[in-house]
Each structure stands twice: as structure tokens, then as C-alpha cells.
Amino acid sequence: MREDTGDFRRLFLSGTPMMDVRAPLEFARGAFPGTVNLPLMDDEERHQVGLCYAEKGQHAAIELGHRLVWGALKATRIAQWADFARAHPDGYLYCFRGGLRSQIVQQWLRDEAGIDYPRVTGGYKAMRGFLIDVIEQAAAKQDFLVLGGLTGTGKTDVIAEVPAAVDLEGLACHRGSAFGRRAQPQPQQIDFENSLAIDVLQRAEAGYRALVVEDEGRFIGGRDLPKVLWQRMQASPMVWLEASFEERVERVLRDYVLGLAAEHIEQLGPVAGFEAYATRLRDAMAAISPRLGSERYGRLSALLEQALTSQSERGETAPHRAWIEVLLRDYYDPMYAYQEEKRAARVVFRGDRAAVTDWLRERSAR
């Protein structure tokens, strides 16, 4: 029989399967990557038990819980837990604090299915606290290298090629600009933070001399980078990625147009997917219209509509280059040039994709 565990580091480093027995609403507010929600009580049952606990105390609340979850419903839930336990003999279960709900699930599994299955002591709350501490410790003690560069230089491509890199935009499911929204929704803030902390933990444990991250604002779409981590990034050495204007236009076309269209069409089908993709581009352009000014916004919107029409009616994507070129030259490049000037003292290396990738691999290696 395996013992209950409080070794959170081992759980997250090994990707141990975990069964979350909290109510679905609790799970939706924040969970860990790969965990499976198989609740002891659903949201309404938990609500009723909570009211009973507040009014009549723990004993009455436990009795009500047993009356609500009984018979065929109880048997179904036990069967689901047993299936998980058999499929993941190395796993664990947990509730919010690792207390009564976890213990009841353990007892029912033991009594009704003959399965001894360990729990995580301290539950979700303790594991969440551990991951918050991981970020704080990394910000205090870990060296970072920050990858910067103009829009379209391929920073995300470099991040994917450096083993010590943490893909902040991948974890946030957002490319980090007005045009950065993906077809898939962003994770909940807490889920983003949990995934980020686990990623940082795994790379720090691997012994890399420095972790590599892309230069980001405090927010990636609607997700907020932990303040201590972002502040550490602002004080860390920078590497500046360079690429020709033509290369950048092609990369923006690939990622922000063709890739975005493919994501939406795969998700919604050719007609609804294309319309959702077109709406996403229009909305992004509108979002930066106050900074573009009315004349430039009108010109870019017209170019965008012409490109969307060509793409929809004839499958042509080349016309998108027209608005991409104007947007890069007149909007993003001046903005990044200003940012580059402010950060010039922090830049320790410059180069193209191959040179920067090699430099980052060497300087971050174990």
C-alpha cells in the first residue's frame, strides 16, 4: 500500500496523474495540468452541504452529504474513481485541503472497490501555495535571459529551439499583441500561473544556468504575468533577434494570418471558421485604431478587407502582405524602436535566428 504524500516537488516534476475530487466549479476556477475532475459532490450538493455546515455544524453536514450521495449515484462515482485508480496505479487524489472529502473518497474506494489509493496531504491549497513559492524563488535566485526583437523576427521559433526556454505565450495561448488572440480561449489566470510554475520548476530542476523567456509586457492578452517574475525579467540581460523586413512580413503572414485561419477553420469548419477568423482580424485592427489615427486606420482596414475578399473568393493570401507591411513599418517598428532604445544597455548579444539560437543554447546550458 502506498502512503499519502506531501512531496509536491516530486508530483509536479514527474507529471504524476492526479484525481481532483473537488466540485466542478472549484475545478474550473483553478486546477493543475493533466488532472482529472471526478468530484465527490457536484456544485449543488456542495452548496447544500456548505449551508448545512454553516447552520448546523460538521456532523450534520456529513450526514446530509451521505444522504445526497447514495445508492446508484454513489455507485457510479465510486466506479469512476476505481477506473481512474486502476488506469493510474501511480496516481493520487486530492480535495481542497486534503481533508474530509479526500478521506471519504479513500474510504469508499477501500470499502466498496477494494482499492487503497493515496491522497495528497494539504490538497489543492497546499500545492497551489507550493507553486506560488516556486515562482517567487525563481524570481529571487534564478538567472534569466530575455529574448527581444521586432514583430515578426521569429522570437517564438527561437524559444521552441532552446531547451532552457519557457514559452510564456504558449502557456498563455496568446501571441502577445492586439493580433495575438488564438482560436482557442486563454486558460484561466490561476491555470496559467500553475502551468508556468511547473514549467519553471522542471527547467530549474534540470540544472540550466539560465532560463530563457521572450520579452513581454505585464499582460499576455488577458493573462497577467506574476509581478515578481515580470520585474525580474525587466532587470535581466537581453538578446536582440534580427531579421530582414521581408522575412518578418512572411512570418507575420504565416503566424497571424494563415495560422490563425487554419485554427479557426479546424475548430468551426470552413464557413463559420473563416468568418470567425476574419472577425478576429477586424477586431484586432479596431483595437489599435486610437493609436493608428482615423486616416491610417481607414487605409489599413480597406487593405484588410481587400485581402479577406481575395482569400475568401479565390484562396489568395498574397494581398495580406499589403496591410502587414504598412502595419509593421508605420506602427509596430517605431514602437519597438523606442523600446529598443530604452533597453539598449541591457542587450548583450544581437544576431539572426541561427546566431541567437546558438548563443542562447550555449549561455543557458547545464
UniProtKB/Swiss-Prot annotation:
* SMART domains noted in UniProt: RHOD
Write down the SUPFAM superfamilies for this protein, in alphabetical order. Rhodanese/Cell cycle control phosphatase
Q: Which residues form the Rhodanese domain?
A: 12-136
GO terms of molecular function: transferase activity, transferring alkyl or aryl (other than methyl) groups; tRNA 2-selenouridine synthase activity
| EC number assigned by the record | 2.9.1.3
* Keyword Transferase attributed: yes
Q: Which UniProt keywords apply?
A: Selenium, Transferase
Catalytic activity field: 5-methylaminomethyl-2-thiouridine(34) in tRNA + selenophosphate + (2E)-geranyl diphosphate + H2O + H(+) = 5-methylaminomethyl-2-selenouridine(34) in tRNA + (2E)-thiogeraniol + phosphate + diphosphate; 5-methylaminomethyl-2-thiouridine(34) in tRNA + (2E)-geranyl diphosphate = 5-methylaminomethyl-S-(2E)-geranyl-thiouridine(34) in tRNA + diphosphate; 5-methylaminomethyl-S-(2E)-geranyl-thiouridine(34) in tRNA + selenophosphate + H(+) = 5-methylaminomethyl-2-(Se-phospho)selenouridine(34) in tRNA + (2E)-thiogeraniol; 5-methylaminomethyl-2-(Se-phospho)selenouridine(34) in tRNA + H2O = 5-methylaminomethyl-2-selenouridine(34) in tRNA + phosphate
The UniProt record lists the keyword Transferase: yes
Annotated GO biological processes are: tRNA wobble uridine modification
User: Which PROSITE patterns does this entry report, sorted A to Z?
Assistant: RHODANESE_3 (PS50206)
Location of the active site? 95
Name of the top EC class for this enzyme: transferase
Q: What does this protein do?
A: Involved in the post-transcriptional modification of the uridine at the wobble position (U34) of tRNA(Lys), tRNA(Glu) and tRNA(Gln). Catalyzes the conversion of 2-thiouridine (S2U-RNA) to 2-selenouridine (Se2U-RNA). Acts in a two-step process involving geranylation of 2-thiouridine (S2U) to S-geranyl-2-thiouridine (geS2U) and subsequent selenation of the latter derivative to 2-selenouridine (Se2U) in the tRNA chain.
Indicate the family of this protein: Belongs to the SelU family.
- NCBIfam families of this UniProt entry? PRK11784.1-3, tRNA_sel_U_synt
Q: What PANTHER family does the database record attribute to this sequence? A: TRNA 2-SELENOURIDINE SYNTHASE
Q: Which HAMAP family does the protein's record reference?
A: tRNA_sel_U_synth (MF_01622)
Oligomer and partners: Monomer.
The protein's name: tRNA 2-selenouridine synthase
What is the phylogenetic placement of the source species in the record? Bacteria, Pseudomonadati, Pseudomonadota, Betaproteobacteria, Burkholderiales
Report which gene this protein is encoded by. Answer: selU
